[in-house]
Every structure is written in C-alpha cells, then in structure tokens.
Amino acid sequence: MTCSGPAARAAGHDGPVHPSGELAAQIVSVLGERGQTLATAESLTGGLLGAAITAIPGASAVYRGGVIAYATELKARLLGVPGDLLARHGPIHPGVAAAMAMGARDRLGATWGLATTGVAGPDPADGFPPGTVHIAASAGSPATRSLALAGARDRIRRDTVDQALRLLLDRLREDAS
C-alpha cells in the first residue's frame, strides 16, 4: 500500500506504509485540532499501539503515554481493572478492554483512553484461540469491539493496532457530530 496526501506527508511517509501510519496521523491531527490528548493501555500489542502514535511528528502534543500491562495482575494494579472482573472473566474480555481504556485515560490524565487485550498466538490462552481480541476507546463511556483475527502472531498484533486506531478514529468522528 502506498499512502500519500497530507496525513502521510505529516507522518514522514513517501512510499509503502502500513495502514496504521495513515490512521495514526489522522488521529494526531484531530486530537491536536481539538486540544485533546490520548493515553494507551496495551496487552497483546506490547507497545505497538504507542509506537504507531509516536511515529507521527507532533504526537508529543497529544500523546500522554501508555501502559503495557502484559501480565494479568498489572491490569489491576497499574490500570485499576477490577479484580472481580478479572477473576470472573479473565484478561480476555471486552469489559477488561473497557476498564483498561478508562484506567489509562484516568491515570495518565488524558482526554481519551485506547486499549488492547487478547490472544496473539500461536497457542490458545485462557481457552481462547489466537486472534481473539478486544479493543476499547473511552472519553466517557467506553466503546468496545470484539475481533476474531486470522494469521500469524505478528499479523494479529499489527491488525489489532489498525483496528484499535480505526475504533478511536470512528469515536472521534462520532464525537464531532
């Protein structure tokens, strides 16, 4: 895929790029125009979501930071995910993604929180097959999406980043209406 146009140029791209670069550039632009900020909470993506945002020039004006809570207990300790939610459903649940997004937003002092949790593979985890993913975006009440992604571990992680960025961009557009 070749990305061109103002968002791609702002991202420093002049050739083939992954869709996340274009999406991240749009998000940084919209957040900047509105004077809003973003924080991320990641599990299976392990920092890829934050990396996609910080790859964009100007991200420092809108990106507060992120928490990589790969271990289940860190989701509770660092992000405030309720222990009873984790005990009842485990870490791979849309409610956990929602709590992670709200926790990142609140604990890092951002307007928006964006979160990823799921199974990258290659093996199942907690009874869920690889590609079972939950994402959430929150500026108030969280919006969640549950995904069933296919492919190898790296592809699932990259596709999760793309889908999370799409969710946030959709929410930003809805928020503007």
Region locations from a protein language model:
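Short alpha-helical segments enriched in small residues
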Residues: T2-S177
